[in-house]
Amino acid sequence: MANYIKEIRALVGHKPLILNTAAGILVNDQQEVLLNLRTDTHNWSLPGGYLEYGETYAEACVREYKEDSGLDVKIVAPIGIFDKGETVYPNGDVVQTITELFLVTAIGGQQLQHATDETIKLAYFDFDNLPPLLNQQT
């Protein structure tokens, strides 16, 4: 069901939706966090995204991390659930997200590269010098 969100939007248009998302925090050896610059909003965010029908939060986190960054990751630990995020996308879609956030670690030694057109670029940032994020609650 890779087009689950598109199918829902075809039915409801831009009306507000509550959707489930998963994201991961990956910290490198320099204690910097990986962020991706999103194509849809031109905001920085943690790699992650919407759950597909039938997926767990952990499965979605691993899948979205691969799509957004090119990295295979494994879940180290859940960090928490955040449920106050509201995003208005440039196309008019309004979404309140319920996000499960995980600490992840990279496996396999791949290079950073985004696998979809959802990511403009990837970069590591020092925790004390983060850019404005798409969803400030995470």
Show which residues each predicted segment covers.
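Active-site beta-strand termini and strand-to-loop segments that position acidic
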Residues: 26-29, 104-106
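Unchanged
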Residues: 51-74, 84-138
